[in-house]
């Protein structure tokens, strides 16, 4: 278990220390579950009343909240961001052994950097290049001529097809598939003719991809995931999609082929986005959004009907089904009124 003096933690976080700097911090916890040795954080003033019951040895908070502190405190401008950074310092995620498992199958032409770890039953095909400190989990497959940049990690059972490029310091969770064929077919009098998908997938630096997500290779041009992009679990990224730098994609999102999404966008969970169009920079699509047309202006966009009691929803659905008839009747009434005038 990692541990650190509170004074040393404050220095690493560039935080202002209030209280005993010799307190030993052994972990991060929520305000409700924290015990002695834990550090917690408060992001909303409404939780001030809980400080008296909190058992944490220290709390991260803003200057405005400091008068309510009942323990040692680290004062920062952004407690949530500080929480993320101190969680990295005190991370308890198991690290793999720095070795190559005897059962791993590695082609003789593969190039491995320094301190590469490869887990049991992983397969590394010919022409693969793994940078320094790359971690390949148990059961992973890395196809021919693919390249994975320094410091990147694949958890167990990740599949990377051939000719894929993954940048530095990326993290890909278990079950994800990168580089499978895109959904490309031509119709010949009712019969589907497969179009070989000869593009690649290019993933930038510092990209994180959740579990069981699929990113298809391009048909001709590449599918591209920009630097700093984060993609949640069970997303489908179709062929030739381009996602701009630092865009966030929540779970269950489906992106159709040849979609281009700008930088700094946020796509809410379970959204469905049409292909062969563009979304500009700094767009937020709220959960379950259905995006059928290009978005050319930054902002927040929503679609769908939020949850309602069933009886209310049934009435709303009936109104929607009859809206065309109601519109025609309204126009007819308007014409009659205008004629009377």
Swiss-Prot record:
Keyword rRNA processing listed: no
Keyword Acyltransferase part of the UniProt annotation: yes
Domain of life from the UniProt record: Bacteria
Pfam hit, one: LpxD
Pathway: Glycolipid biosynthesis; lipid IV(A) biosynthesis; lipid IV(A) from (3R)-3-hydroxytetradecanoyl-[acyl-carrier-protein] and UDP-N-acetyl-alpha-D-glucosamine: step 3/6
Keywords (A to Z) from UniProt: Acyltransferase, Lipid A biosynthesis, Lipid biosynthesis, Lipid metabolism, Repeat, Transferase
GO biological process, alphabetically ordered: lipid A biosynthetic process
Reaction catalysed by this enzyme: a UDP-3-O-[(3R)-3-hydroxyacyl]-alpha-D-glucosamine + a (3R)-hydroxyacyl-[ACP] = a UDP-2-N,3-O-bis[(3R)-3-hydroxyacyl]-alpha-D-glucosamine + holo-[ACP] + H(+); UDP-3-O-[(3R)-3-hydroxytetradecanoyl]-alpha-D-glucosamine + (3R)-hydroxytetradecanoyl-[ACP] = UDP-2-N,3-O-bis[(3R)-3-hydroxytetradecanoyl]-alpha-D-glucosamine + holo-[ACP] + H(+)
Subunit structure: Homotrimer.
Entry protein name: UDP-3-O-(3-hydroxymyristoyl)glucosamine N-acyltransferase
Species whose genome carries this gene: Escherichia coli O6:H1 (strain CFT073 / ATCC 700928 / UPEC)
Lineage of source species: Bacteria, Pseudomonadati, Pseudomonadota, Gammaproteobacteria, Enterobacterales
């Amino acid at each position: 278990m990692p541990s650190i003096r509170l004074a040393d933690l404050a220095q690493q976080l560039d935080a202002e220390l209030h209280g005993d700097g010799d307190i030993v911090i052994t972990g991060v916890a929520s305000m409700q579950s924290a015990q002695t040795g834990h550090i917690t954080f408060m992001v909303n003033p409404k939780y001030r009343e809980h400080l008296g019951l909190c058992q944490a040895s220290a709390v991260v908070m803003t200057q405005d909240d400091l008068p309510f502190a009942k323990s040692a405190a680290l004062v920062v401008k952004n407690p949530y961001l500080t929480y993320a950074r101190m969680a990295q310092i005190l991370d308890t995620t198991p690290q793999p052994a720095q070795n190559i498992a005897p059962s791993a199958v590695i082609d003789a032409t593969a190039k491995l950097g320094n301190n590469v770890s490869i887990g049991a039953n992983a397969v590394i095909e010919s022409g693969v290049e793994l940078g320094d400190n790359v971690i390949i989990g148990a059961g992973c497959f890395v196809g021919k001529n693919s390249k994975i940049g320094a410091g990147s990690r694949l958890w167990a059972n990740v599949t990377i097809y051939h000719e894929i490029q993954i940048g530095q310091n990326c993290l890909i969770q278990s079950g994800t598939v990168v580089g499978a064929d895109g959904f490309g077919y031509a119709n010949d009098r009712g019969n589907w003719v497969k179009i070989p998908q000869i593009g690649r997938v290019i993933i930038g630096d510092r990209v994180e991809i959740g579990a069981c997500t699929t990113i298809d290779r391009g048909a001709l041009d590449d599918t591209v995931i920009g630097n700093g992009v984060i993609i949640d679990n069970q997303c489908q990224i179709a062929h030739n999609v381009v996602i701009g730098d630092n865009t966030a994609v929540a779970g269950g999102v489906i992106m159709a082929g040849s979609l281009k999404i700008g930088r700094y966008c946020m796509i809410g969970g379970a959204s469905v986005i049409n292909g062969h169009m563009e979304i500009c920079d700094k767009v937020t699509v709220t959960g379950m959004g259905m995006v059928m047309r290009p978005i050319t202006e930054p902002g927040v966009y929503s679609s769908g009907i939020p949850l309602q009691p069933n009886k209310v929803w049934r009435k709303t659905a009936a109104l929607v089904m009859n809206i065309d008839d109601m519109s025609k009747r309204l126009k007819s009434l308007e014409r009659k009124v205008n004629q009377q005038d």
